[in-house]
Amino acid sequence: MLKPLGDRVLVEIIEEAEQKTAGGLYVPDSAKEKSQRGKVVAVGTGKTLDNGTKVAMEVKEGDTVYFAKYGGTEVSLEGKNYSLLSERDLLAIVE
């Protein structure tokens, strides 16, 4: 598994169910919108400010989050898709 550095978060992308058009045609993966929801599987230690103070992360492992559509770096590990994001690219935590 990857250990994010600083204020980065590793999010396992939650794949959406197979999509079908009103006419009954299946939408291929290449035509689907990129998923914007995932489960946090690892977090960094937090952001370090210029004065050396460490800012704690707001998210924790296990949180379900929404993130910026084109934010982060996509990573595939052990057959699963992940996104490595800065905490600022996270939009919301699902409660």
Curated annotation (Swiss-Prot):
The keyword Cytoplasm applies. Keywords: Chaperone, Cytoplasm. Pfam families: Cpn10. Signal peptide: none annotated. It comes from the Bacteria. GO terms for molecular function: ATP binding; metal ion binding; protein folding chaperone; protein-folding chaperone binding; unfolded protein binding. It is found in: Cytoplasm. GO terms for cellular component: cytoplasm. The keyword Nucleus does not apply. One of its GO terms (biological process) is chaperone cofactor-dependent protein refolding. Belongs to the GroES chaperonin family. NCBIfam families: PRK00364.2-2 (NF001531), PRK00364.2-4 (NF001533), PRK00364.2-5 (NF001534). Heptamer of 7 subunits arranged in a ring. Interacts with the chaperonin GroEL. Together with the chaperonin GroEL, plays an essential role in assisting protein folding. The GroEL-GroES system forms a nano-cage that allows encapsulation of the non-native substrate proteins and provides a physical environment optimized to promote and accelerate protein folding. GroES binds to the apical surface of the GroEL ring, thereby capping the opening of the GroEL channel. This is Co-chaperonin GroES.
